[in-house]
Amino acid sequence: MDSFQFFEWLLRDIERNLLYTSLVYTNPKIAIVRYEPSENAKLWRSKELNTDSPNELLLTLKKTLDECSTLDEKIETLLRIRYFTVYVGDKSDKRNIIRSWLSTTINRLNVEEYASIQEIELQAKQWRAENAKSLRPYHYNIPINEYLRDNEIEVLDTGDNRWKSDTLQGLLPNFYHRTHTLIGAILFAVTSRLEIYSYEQKKALRYLLRTIEKCYNEGYLEMSRDRKWSHTLPELRTLTFRLYNSKVIHAACAMISLVHANPIDYEFLCQVVAVYQIIPANAAKLLSTPMTLYVGVATFSSNQVASTGNASECAPLQIENNIYVSEAQKKEWAESFKSDPLNKSRMLKLMNENLNTTLDKFSLIFNCFSSTFHVGHRIDNAQDAITDQVTATYTSNVNREMYDSYYYKLKQMLKEEIVQYVEDHVAKQYKDVTAESLSALANSSNGFSKEVKFIDRNIKTTKKILHLDNDLITNDYSDLSKALSHGIPMGTRNVPARQTRGIFILPWQVAAVQHTIAESLYKRAKKGAYQGSFAEAYTAKTASLTYGVLAEDTSKATKIILYTDVSQWDASQHNTEPYRSAWINAIREARAELKWRYDDEPKVLEMNVLDSMIKIQEYLLNSNLVVASPGSQRPTKIIRYHGVASGEKTTKIGNSFANVALIETVLDFAKTDIPDLEISHLRVDGDDNVVSINTSCTIDRLQRIIKEKYSSLNARVKALASYTGLEMAKRFIICGKIFERGAIPIFTAERPYGTDVSIQSMCGSSIYSSAVNAYRGFGDAYFSFMQDVLVPPSASTRITGRLRVLMSPVTLYATGPLSFEITPQGLGGRCRFFTQSAKLFTLFKMLTQTAAVSITPDEIKKYAETVQFKKRTEVMIASMQRKLLVPAKALARIIVDKEQQKTLGVPNVQSQKNRSQVSKAIEILGVPERNDIVAKGYYPEELYSLIISHSVVVYTSHSTPISIYRVNCEPVELLRSQLGIRIADSKPIAKPTNHLYDIVSGLSPIKISPSDLLTQAKKYDLSTYKGKRDYLSDLGLVGNTLKTYLASKMLFRDLLMSKYDDLYSTPGFGATQLTTIPLDVTSAEKVFSIRLGLPPHLYEVVMLLLLYEYIHYVFSCKRTFTAQMHAISQEQSAVITKNIILMLDNIQLDQVSFSDDAW
């Protein structure tokens, strides 16, 4: 941010955090701790500083600021504030403060109520009565005492606050602040905006706040961070508050935040909460369902899209799009609108009125759709959910001919893959794949608990890595049937609007065996095997563009687009016996046809990979699922199951293969009824599939035939067909525009947060999620509201019971254990400050670095010395050396380092690490500024400021281009208009090749990153020939490769490339917001022109650094410019170049911790 904006932002944030403190605590006392030299080491211990109330302190601060004559002095005053100490006399009445604050706020919103709420409540109650059979007791929002009276089996009483209940724990929102803290933060953010709300917004706010008040006053169940419940069971048996009260409060808070989204329908938000109170487990699903059909019948005018047929290349044209909706589709919509159980829903009414609509109106409806997911995660009891999931009923009347065709297709595909897999390994003489397979094991659960030795003590643990180490020592692992004979334990995943899903927890042997096969399948799918019908072939860095072909089809409306959804895919019949036998017979046939030597087949820990794969498949044909519910008195259930096990390494890619075989079989047989069926595009992604079809057949007949063909394979499907819109993998493509739902719930979480992460880092990830929601549709006002809610409660850290430290916003938006690790604009990294003043910048650096500490726990170091750990790394290193035929000491060290990091997955080790980091950071806060503490390294801003100070800056404005990818975010639109829109996943034109990294990653069996090369390089004296040579041969380079590389003098250049590799590898430094903007050297040259004699690879690095800083500038200042360097003399040029090279050697890049999983 430039100085003025930085000052405004800093002051506003400080003011907001102080005001929040004054509102939620009874007369807190606050003092400022400044950066001023002082003798006393523990400055914040002295209490007499705590004199002012927050408001008095703000007045004094503002007075001081008014007395400053220049902007720099004002900024200096604020940057000298290191943190505030907050002393709270009495905390017990915080809940009461919030209760009275709630009622005063409601009274200030004196507007009328909505009428339509009762209508939809009535419909929800009707639905509940009609579907009573399929609902469990905990799906009803009934008083807690009734629930406990009728469901004793669901709880285990311990006589105190530590009783257990899986089911009741699923009714907690799992937010990392107490519920009353969240209400306080919401009220704080709402109160500060009361003057600017419209009448409609006030109506919605009043309804939502009254809902919160009702639940808050009734009471609710809560669990503290140390896993104690707020009530004991005997207390609960006398209380009448409802089961879902705390979840309703959180859902209402989410809807209040969405009142700030633009565009949105306020009344619909209230309806969501109304329905949620009646049918909490089904509200989101029922309210969001109509979208799938609507996207196929709705149309609006936009532009045609041209694509090259290559998935990631598409561009909008100036021609208007074609629109076509058949009568059959309209009829289908009318029927489903009539029969929808909740057709009083505002969203459904809007849909019905807007079948022919505009882009803006569609965006409003789409935002309403996204909002239904914000009621939060649905969490069912694992036993109930898994039983529902795996029991699919089959009939025996299948079409044998189709079945055989499906089985044969699948077997042929898998056989081809296996042949390819073995041949690749034989050709490279790469037999022992142990190192690769073991390094890919994550330290997750192994399914059952086992007593193992950990350093100096025996612990019971379920962690894969510790089981593996123990099995290696006892040499008891190669009998797969023994490992699988315990049955397969189940874990769960919770998502909004869907029933809880089971996850199979398979023993580590399965993951190790399947790893290399899965890798090989993925690799081939990525290269576009089978006409590129796998979504994996489209894992471009910009997944948004991979839908180019579909965007084209929907904008031209000449093809029928068929999207099918197989219900209960994993448990369907075609996934049972045929899927498993296809694997088994594919392996047997591949072996029979090609006579390679049995000894040459890949092995993991001396187990033959293909033999073991057959064993696994045979076992899974008839497996026992063990479903326990430890927090209840339910007995453990054992279920026989034959379907696909989600939890295998090959699940997703195996599903995709089965899906291709299935859809091709269905289409082949459909051709007998529809001779002119021509397929122009087929895409599968796990169990989703989409096909574009040219045919003269009518749309309703096509749907009917496809459904028949599926059901003769015994697969139950929803087959939807349309000309102008479809849904795939949670993205909606309509009329040539791509929409993504902003459906990340912020105030609920899938699981309880661990005690081992600081509140700040959790808050950081919430801010990031809110930024993504805002960017995908809710807009900038929603994001600023979310920050007002999330930041103030997380801005302070507890020191003792009554003393808290409120940190400076600069420290909060930096990196480290007490920081959000995100910028105030929602990009990953730390906040930016652009200034020409060295003194201010040093203060800024001090603030960003005060709390940045990283500690390696002792237990990691200790475990690395044990026999168990050494055995695992020895096995891996030996396997690597068998592949490379040289000792490769540096690679061996990389293996050891990577394996050491896995020890963090052991319970308590991660907690230990985080706790010690937090306490260390707090300790550092206690040390005043000493003269010998100097801020380390250069920040990229300094490079940016250096260039800008020698350039002519011209502010520009550009016309907005037509976009295919829908966003609601001003800075992104500005950047797109200046830099254009990424239309292909093109490599930055001349990304210099890092030869060393390419050579080593080709040799190494484990995945390595450029930073690993850098770490190892520090251990050698690279100024001598011998040092260089040792370094390279330790990385595994031999013979000619080694000689040629040494002679090419490229080592230092490649190491520099390794250091800046992050600049190239993260499109938009991992932030979703930037994936559609081309961030490469070409773009940088549109903004900056530098006239300096820099060597080409340095020139690129400098340009990219400048571009990234420029992006931060646009995000915070919302304006664009171009900067051209002055004509300067040779001497000046030499001085600047020297400065730049000095900076590049010591620059500190952000470590970004949030990148969106979707990409």
UniProtKB/Swiss-Prot annotation:
Transmembrane segments: none annotated. One of its GO terms (molecular function) is nucleotide binding. InterPro entries: DNA/RNA_pol_sf, RNA-dir_pol_luteovirus, RNA-dir_pol_reovirus. SUPFAM superfamilies: DNA/RNA polymerases. It is an enzyme of class 2 (transferase). Keywords: Nucleotide-binding, Nucleotidyltransferase, RNA-binding, RNA-directed RNA polymerase, Transferase, Viral RNA replication, Virion. GO terms for cellular component: virion component. Interacts with VP3 (Potential). Interacts with VP2 (Potential). Interacts with NSP5; this interaction is probably necessary for the formation of functional virus factories. This is RNA-directed RNA polymerase. The lineage of its organism: Viruses, Riboviria, Orthornavirae, Duplornaviricota, Resentoviricetes.
